[in-house]
Amino acid sequence: MSIVKSFAVDNGDMFYIQHNSDNFTIIDCNLNAETAGERIEELKLKSQHKGITRFISTHPDQDHFGGIELLDDKMPIANFYVVKNKATKSEETESFKHYCKLRDDPVKAFYVYKGCTRKWMNQTDEVRGSSGVNILWPDVNNPDFKDALKACNEGGSPNNISAVVWYALEGGATVMWLGDLETEFMEKITDHIVLEKTTIVFASHHGRDSGKIPDSWLEKLDPQIIVIGEAPSRHLNYYTGYKTITQNRAGDITMELVDNKVHFYVSNPQYKRSDLKDEGADTFDNYIGSIEVETEYTLEGATA
């Protein structure tokens, strides 16, 4: 069993994976003085028995590293996985300065790229098992990525240098994170990234139209659930034809991955679903239903 949690952190992203091995992974953060204490205490509690904790930064955007200095102060980051960049900002926040400090640290930083390997991210040895995390993008030699990196390093948008992170529970569900990749960029790299059927996909750019996952990707991913993050409703794309969970309504979303099933829990007790199977799961509060992991392509969805 493993746990994947998506925090409701306003217009930003923050996740963790409590692996079924000796690993704990945090993906992005968006903390402030009001929320940091409770969030960090949960991270410390959930990771306390894990030998390896890593932080994966998808890209250098304020709402994906906000409050990282608060996290690092209370829960020191020893393994910082990041796309290599020299991003610049017209206004440097304390969080950006701290991000740069971690990014450029010769000991703590590990620069991720398509197909990279590392103990114990995706390699196993006699000490501990793999986390099951793989990096599908960026291809640092791809010309479109190089253009996006150049723009980012010159003070432009960092969205299209986002890492694509893919997690697989052995014999169970798969989960994908896309950072803030934009639709046009995803279309450009369709033939240069390996995509396979994925159980749960976190929509790019918090579900905004600007990060709508193109059909060319959705056909390969064939997701059972698309999670739409927090953004103003007028900017969201609701992915007609697919089952979705919207963080604006659900609040924190906790996914319990058990064998070939995923049980879903939310922090909003008023949020209900009738299109998920009732397995009677009760590990956490506010259970809303479950899915059984598909292994064959269906290319059929249901509006939710």
Regions found by a protein language model. Give the residues of each.
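Metal-dependent catalytic neighborhoods of phosphoester/phosphodiester hydrolases
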Residues: 65-74, 90-100, 213-218, 237-240
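Active-site-proximal beta-strand/loop segments in catalytic clefts of secreted hydrolases
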Residues: 28-30, 57-60, 83-85, 114-116, ...
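Conserved glycine-bearing catalytic or ligand-binding loops at nucleotide- and phosphate-handling centers
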Residues: 92-129
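Long, structured stretches of catalytic cores involved in phosphate-ester chemistry, encompassing
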Residues: 97, 190-263
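Active-site metal-binding motif and surrounding structural segment of the metallo-beta-lactamase
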Residues: 25, 33-87, 192-208, 219-226
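Core dinuclear metal-dependent hydrolase active-site scaffold
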Residues: 1-50, 114-197, 251-261, 266-304
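Active-site environment of divalent metal-dependent phosphoester hydrolases
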Residues: 11, 33-34, 60-65, 86-90, ...
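Hydrophobic/aromatic beta-strand patches that form the interior of the parallel beta-sheet core
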Residues: 5-7, 25, 56, 81, ...
